[in-house]
Amino acid sequence: MIEAIGNQYVVARPVYSTKAFGEEFKKTYGHHKTFLDHLKGCCSCSSQKAKKIALSLFPIASWLPAYKIKEWLLSDIVSGISTGLVAVLQGLAFALLVNIPPAYGLYAAFFPVITYFFLGTSRHISVGPFPVLSMMVGVVVTRVASGSDTSPALSSSSAENDSMIEEKVMVAASVTVLSGIIQLLLGVLQIGFVVIYLSESLISGFTTAAAIHVLVSQLKFMLQLTVPAHSDPFSIFKVLESVFSQIQKTNIADLVTSVIILVVVFVVKEINQRYRSKLPVPIPIELIMTVIATGISYGCNFEQRFGVAVVGNMSLGFQPPITPSVEVFQDTIGDCFGIAIVGFAVAFSVASVYSLKYDYPIDGNQELIALGVSNIFTGAFKGFAGSTALSRSGVQESTGGKTQVAGLLSAVIVLIVIVAIGFLLQPLQKSVLAALALGNLKGMLMQFAEIGRLWKKDKYDCLIWIMTFIFAIVLGLGLGLAASVAFQLLTIVFRTQFPKCSTLANVGRSNIYKNKKNYADVYEPEGVKIFRCPSPIYFANIGFFKQKLIDAVGFNPLRILRKRNKALKKIRKLQKQGLIQVTPKGFICTSDGFKDSDEELDNNQIEELDQPINTTDLPFEIDWNADLPLNITIPKISLHSLILDFSAVSFLDISSMRGLRTILQEFIRIKVDVYIVGTDDDFIDKLARCEFFDDEVTDSIFFLTIHDAILHIWMKKDYSTSKFNSSQEKERKFDFTINTNGGLRNRECQVPVETKF
C-alpha cells in the first residue's frame, strides 16, 4: 500500500527477499524464439513486408509523393543553387588534399549527390567531398602511388607526366570503391552500430587533428613549394621541416593572394555566423572571391608574370568509368575501413542533428547503404571518397532547403560546370583553392575549446580528446584512428577495472542509502556493512572488488577463518592433553603453563584451515569475540551482516562468479550473513545456470532493496535475542516504524509489516 501525505509518502508492504517476491508474484514468460523462428521470419514474405522493404531501401518513395511543391520548391531551388556553387569550389579545393588534379573534385561533388537523392534518409545533409576524408584518401595515395612527389603544379600541364596522374587517380578511385563496399556490407548486415565505438570526444579530437593535417598540407600550395610527400608516422613534422627548409623560395604572389583570400573568407564567415538571423541567405564569399581571383589572375596574366600555379586544363565532360585495382584493395583495406567508418560517423552525426531539429526519422543502416553506393558509384567515375561537409550542409539548410531536391539541384550546378563552363576556372590560382579549403576549417579548429569544457564535465572524455588528437597528429590519420579507438576502449576497461566502490549508510532516517563519506548526518546500523559496486564484475576487476570489500569491512575474512580453525585445532589439542575441559557452560582451564605458538603450516594444513568451522563435537557454540583460554588469541570482529548493493552490476562472467562465490563463502564461514540486493531476475537466473549456488551460498541471500535486507537483519536478530508469544512465532508478524529522532527502528508498533524470508 502506498499512501501520499503532503510531499511525503508512506509505504506499507512486506519485507521481500527475491525468492519470496517471486513466490507471491508469478512471472509471465513470453515465447522464446529459436534460431529457426528468426530464420522463418526473415525468409517469409508478404505484400506488406515487401512494401516495407522497398520503402526502406528507397526512402525517396515515401517522401517524394508527399512533396509540397508550392511550399517547398522555391526554397529548394534557392538552396540548391547556393549549395551547388559551394560544392564546385569545395570539390576543386579538396582535390588538392587527395593529390590529384582539381577537376576530379567535380566528379566527387556530383555523383554521390545523385545516388543519395534516391537512397538517403536525411533531407538536409549535402553529400560530397569532406576535408578529413580527402586528407585520409590523400595519405593513401601518397603511400601507394609509386614515385609520389607532391608538387604545387599538380595538373596535366605540370612537369609530372600523365601516367603518374593516372596512377594517383586509380589509387584514389580504388580506395573510394573499397570504402563504399565496406559501408554497403555493414549496412546490408545491419551492423551500423559499429559507429558507437567512435564517441563524440574521439570524433572531435580526430577531426581537429585532421584539420591540422589539412592546414599543413596546404602550405605547399599557398607558398608554391616543392614538398616531398610523406605518409608514415611523424609525417606532419617532416612536411613542416621541408616547408621551412625552403621557405626562402616562397612565391610572394601566391602567398599574398592566399593570405588576402583567407582573411576575407574568415571575416565574412564570422559575419554570416553572427548575423545569420538577419541575413536572408549567407553571403557566398567563396564564390565571390573565386570570381574575383579568377578574373584578376586572367586579366593580369599571373601565371606568366609571377609564375603562380593555376588549375590549368579543365577537360569538359565526363571520363569513362574504370575498373578498380585489386592490388590497391589488398594494400589499403585497413585504411579503407577507417575511411568508411569516419565517413559514416560524420555523416550520421550531422544527419542526426537535423533529424532532431526537424523531427523526422533517419535509419543508420540505410545511411550506410546510401553512402556505400555513393562511394562505389563515385569511385567508378574517378572521384574520391565523400561524406558530408558541415559547412556545405549548413548552407543547404540555412538557405531554406527542405528536402534532397535541393541536393539534386546542387548536382545540376556541378554538372553545368563539368560539361560547359569548367574552362573558365583554368586561370584560378591553386593558392586560392588552398585558402578556400582552410577557410572551411574554422569550425573544426574551434573545437580546441572542447578541452576546457570536457575537463569540467568528464576528465576521461577530455583525456580521450587529447590522446586522439596526439595520436592522429603523430601517427597519422590511419594509425591515429586505430590507436584512438583502442585507447578509448582502454578507458572503458580502466573505469570498470577500478570502479569507485563505496560504503553506504542511511540518510534522513528513511529508506534512502548513500555514500556515507558524502553526508554528515548518516546512520550506519551497528554490525551491518553496506557495500556498493558501481560497475560490472568480471575477470579483470574481481581482485580489485575483493580488496575494496576487505578495506570496507576492515578485515580479511579468509585470515579470520584460518585463525579460528587454527584456534579450534589448538583447543582440541589442549583438550586431549588435559590442559582444558570443555563443558556446556564453556572452557575450564586445568593449567596455565601453556604458551601459544604460531608455527608454520604446510599447504595441506592451510587447505584444512580454509574449510568451514566444525564445532559439532563441542557441547556449545564458541563465542569468537570472547576471550579464549590459555592466551589463544584471534582477531575479534563486530560485523554480523554484509549487504552487497549490486544494483549497478550489469553482468558477471564465469571467472568473477568463482571469485564472488569464494568471497561469499569466506564471510559465511565466519558467521557473517551476506545479502545481495538490487539485482534483476536475469542476473539470478544466470547464476543458477552456472551452478553458482551450493549448500553455503543459496538463493535466499537475494533481496529486492537495501531496506528490505536491513529490516530482515533486524527481525532476524530479534528472533534470536527476544522471546515472543506463540501466535507471533507462528505467524511471524512484527511491527516496525521509522523514528526520525532516534534511528530507523522503534519498538513501538505503528506500521504493520509482514516479514518474509
Curated annotation (Swiss-Prot):
Residues annotated as glycosylated: 161
**What does the entry's PTM section describe?**
N-glycosylation is required for efficient cell surface expression, and protection from proteolytic degradation.
SUPFAM superfamilies, A to Z? SpoIIaa-like (SSF52091)
Q: GO molecular-function annotation terms?
A: bicarbonate transmembrane transporter activity; chloride transmembrane transporter activity; chloride:bicarbonate antiporter activity; oxalate transmembrane transporter activity; secondary active sulfate transmembrane transporter activity; sulfate transmembrane transporter activity
Q: What topology does it adopt in the membrane?
A: Multi-pass membrane protein
Cytoplasmic face residues: 1-71, 115-124, 198-201, 272-278, 357-367, 426-462
Q: Which UniProt keywords apply?
A: Antiport, Cell membrane, Chloride, Glycoprotein, Membrane, Transmembrane, Transmembrane helix, Transport
Name a GO CC annotation attached to this entry: membrane
Record-annotated membrane-spanning stretches? 72-92, 94-114, 125-145, 177-197, 202-222, 251-271, 279-299, 336-356, 368-388, 405-425, 463-483
Q: Which domain of life is it from?
A: Eukaryota
The protein's matches in InterPro entries, at most eight in alphabetical order, are given as:
S04_transporter_CS, SLC26A/SulP_dom, SLC26A/SulP_fam, STAS_dom, STAS_dom_sf
Pfam families per UniProt? STAS, Sulfate_transp
**Residues in domain STAS?**
518-713
Write down the chemical reaction(s) this protein catalyses. Answer: hydrogencarbonate(in) + 2 chloride(out) = hydrogencarbonate(out) + 2 chloride(in)
Key word Ribosomal protein present in the record? Answer: no
Q: Which protein family is named in the record?
A: Belongs to the SLC26A/SulP transporter (TC 2.A.53) family.
**PANTHER family xrefs:** SULFATE TRANSPORTER
- What name does UniProt use for this protein? Chloride anion exchanger
The source organism is Rattus norvegicus
Q: What is the lineage of its organism?
A: Eukaryota, Metazoa, Chordata, Craniata, Vertebrata
